[in-house]
């Protein structure tokens, strides 16, 4: 196999996010429900025989050492393969949004190169590599909506109804490290249960990061209030700055403020997905 094209890397929303503690090494303990969206980046891969890794940014310039290249390099180091790749990225997901765009790109890269390079690593091995890159990567590798705990490594699949969502991404982004470094962040939320979430998935819990985010980026509050003015219950996803709201059947969004487009805001209607397009691309441990 010489190439793989049109590889999707979908976004996620955190339906809720509770911070339940902090480990001695500084990592925060979380509980959350991750849901896949039909908004995605698109990746293309060409195999190289010289072992080199290169990247082409087709829509939006990315940092020189982004998660996609780091994922490819980590896979090379873990396996000792001499294969390389040229990776082209059509970046549509906004950065610093709390939607997992970089982590999703990394996961799709690991799955695609595992196939392109004929490595046949099981999913568990890819998850180990993925967790070293970012807490959200294992979720995207599993590829199903999930209840997530710990630092992102405890993943339990959940079934969610099909639904539409309004997503608003302010022009400003938020760095995850700034949110978690805030002394105002509460880190002692009581543990919740999957059963409690399953009974009311669309309005369960809250996002414990939201109050800190609104202070660092007032546009988060502006987006929530705009959705609220349309009788929609909005909250932030992940560490922001994107916010979202469930759209009831037949609900149409009103016109966004005129300055938003000029200031780089994005307003989009999305639907959730049951499974990631690449589910099954890595063998399970039982089949290896």
Predicted feature residues:
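Residue-level signal for inorganic ion chemistry
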Residues: 15, 43-45, 68, 102, ...
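Conserved, helical-rich catalytic subdomain that frames metal- and/or nucleotide-binding sites
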Residues: 53, 140-142, 147-233, 248-288
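Gly/Ser/Thr-rich beta-alpha loop segments that engage phosphate groups in nucleotides
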Residues: 23, 68, 100-104, 136, ...
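Contiguous, small/hydrophobic- and glycine-enriched helical/loop subdomains that border
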Residues: 84, 106, 110-147
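Short beta-strand scaffold segments in enzyme catalytic cores
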Residues: 17, 41-45, 136-140, 146-147, ...
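Glycine/serine-rich anion-binding loops at beta->alpha junctions
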Residues: 88-117, 135, 233-247
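ATP-binding N-lobe of GHMP and related small-molecule kinases
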Residues: 1-97, 115-124, 169-172
